């Protein structure tokens, strides 16, 4: 062996020499800190959702305001829409657009009156029904 190799082996060790590490096959038991669960981190989600529930009343004047209504539904707010100030064709387009929005968030849309609708996201539950007593021919022909 050359002097260089001897010096290298002295400081670096022999390249064929391996270190053996004795490993215990015993599994380590978890410490108390790991096993202990902090009960203060548990939050009841239903109470969080109920505290932020809102109902928004909107009376659109044209189809362009449908996006604002849809944004409220996507943000998990119930919306009551009064379509009395919109002509029938635009009102029908608004209802169609909102029906798609409500479907996307797994919500519900209900007719409350002749030109009034309630759109709710999935976090709002509506109970009860409203029935119309008299049907005027004009309202019946609108095709809601």
UniProtKB/Swiss-Prot annotation:
Membrane-crossing residue ranges in chain numbering: none
Q: GO terms for biological process?
A: division septum assembly; FtsZ-dependent cytokinesis
Which compartments is it annotated to reside in? Cytoplasm
What are the GO cellular component annotations? Answer: cytoplasm
- Family to which this protein belongs: Belongs to the SepF family.
| The protein's assembly and partners | Homodimer. Interacts with FtsZ.
**What does the record give as the function of this protein?**
Cell division protein that is part of the divisome complex and is recruited early to the Z-ring. Probably stimulates Z-ring formation, perhaps through the cross-linking of FtsZ protofilaments. Its function overlaps with FtsA.
Q: What is this protein called?
A: Cell division protein SepF
**What is the species listed in this Swiss-Prot or TrEMBL entry?**
Oceanobacillus iheyensis (strain DSM 14371 / CIP 107618 / JCM 11309 / KCTC 3954 / HTE831)
Q: Output the lineage of the source organism.
A: Bacteria, Bacillati, Bacillota, Bacilli, Bacillales
